[in-house]
Amino acid sequence: MKPNHSVNSIGDPINRVDGVLKVTGQARYAAEHTHAMPQTPLVGFLVASTSAVGEITHLDTSKAEKAEGVQAVLTHTNAGPLKAFSQPDDEGRFTQSRAVLNDSHIRHYGMPVALVLAHTLEQARYAASLVAFNIDAQPAQLLLAPDQATEVPESLDGGFEPDVESGVAPTQSATDINVDMQYTTPSQISAAMEPHATIAHFDGDKLTVYPSVQIVASAVQALATTLEMDEDNIHVKSPFIGGGFGSKLGLHYDAILACIGARYLERPVKVALSRRHVFYNTPHRGHSFQRMQLSCNSQGYLTSIAHHSAMPKAKGYTFAEATGAGARVTYHANYINSTHRVKSADTPLIDSTRSPGDAIGSLAFESAIDELAHKANIDPLTFRLNNMPKVHPVNGSRFTSHKLESCLQRGADIFGWQQKSNAKPGKVIGHGVASAMRMNVLVQSSANVAIDKNGMITVTTDMTDIGTGTYTILAQIAADAFNTSVDNVTVNLGDSQSPASCGSGGSFGAASTGSAVLKACEAVKSSLLSLLPEDYRDAQFLVTDKGLCVRQSNSEKIQETPL
């Protein structure tokens, strides 16, 4: 482990700058910000629907209201004004209304029917069991077979087109080798270590919210939309997040319920979902039906790739997973056809879940590639290497980078692929290879960087750290920019009053916000250089025991820089 006081630490396994806070319990997560509240927060516990879809016809909260410690029971009859769920429909999915307890309609199994507010969790949970309700259940619309998915989504997650067809479908010859495979994957849920939780507090018309959310800026917008408030009156803080994997990209019921409760009682409220609640009140990955049709010639060169995906889409929510995106770029083929079909279903939200699209799409695609290589009697590694694209297989554009070939070759060398023994007939134990492709995504981000005369650097942005090391990454970037160690860098994250970033998600966080931090560092250095004499214009900054210093190019002279 490289000591943190060394310089040029990018890429080195240094100690995480927030590590001590975490291992000593000083890093506060969403449900732990009670110290910042003017009163001890009341605890909210939700009452969950037992039907997948229908209308609430009867609701009796009288017994719950009389239970020990209970301060209020909120339902759609008294929760207060909220903009209808998923409105306005021209907004992005993370900024639309996330309304709950706003009408009698049940959209999915487990949806909150009521919220009990009490002094303790035990009191709230017991009182929740006393709430009586009836639901006029209706048949749920679900995706049970691929041919039921007939809707073409407007777009896919990541901005991909739902359907792509490139080249001309080849005429089959007698020597062509084909596979036509069906793959299914189950629905999946992130179930991060930290369940979704929120503490909310109103001070007059000012709302402060501590949620567990990956993108802070859109959380402010979603709260403003849902609660019909001015964004300037909302302050969101999310300094530490115990895992997200996409399930916390946007706000969910815990945040809205906490805000509704705080508004109703005019005191702080905490709502933390139980592990059971997480499974039907937060986003999940929908199950998939995938058909892979691949063809190659007798030499093992791909002639045709067809990837057809069918998945459910939550009603009132725009997300559709880009399952076939990988098949469009991983290997070269003369003909590529990729389609996506969905069915609007009465389910909890379906949204980005750990490596959306790629995780399940590459599973089907790479499995089919293996099947084709086996049928062609060609080594699966050789088969892949023979089909590396020189340009984008669909649009012909030049890749910024496409490192799959070198990755496979390096992996084969480390693994000793050439020395492997073939599996014996009838045996299922052997060696294999598979590829995974994740497109590089950059999203607009901003950051503020300040440095004082002692060389102490402060980085401020609303970027979040979901356990991926953002605090350390940004500290390393700033430290390297000024030729100092991360010990001289303070990073402030997760506050909506800071410059807006991309947030964490889609594997774009470090690259996008890291670039913003680097640009801000360069701007600071440029401003400082403009104050120096002409012969220092090509100088370098560094931090010594004298504080912030400047060194002339090609010179050993070090001179303190006045700030």
Q: What does each model-identified segment do?
A:
Residues 148-227, 387-456, 541:
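Helix-loop-helix junctions that connect adjacent transmembrane helices in secondary transporters/permeases
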Residues 1-157, 181, 254, 326, ...:
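Flexible, low-hydrophobicity surface segments
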Residues 269-290, 434-437, 444:
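Structured beta-strand/loop patches that form or line metal/cofactor-binding pockets in enzymes
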Residues 17-21, 44, 129-142, 221, ...:
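Extended active-site and interfacial segments that coordinate phosphate-rich ligands
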Residues 114-118, 124-128, 226, 256-268, ...:
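Stable alpha-helical structural segments in soluble proteins, enriched in small hydrophobic residues
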Residues 12, 17-25, 89-92, 160-198, ...:
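Glycine-rich loop/linker segments at domain edges
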Residues 74-111, 218, 236-257, 276-291, ...:
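Short, surface-exposed loop/turn segments at secondary-structure boundaries that line and modulate
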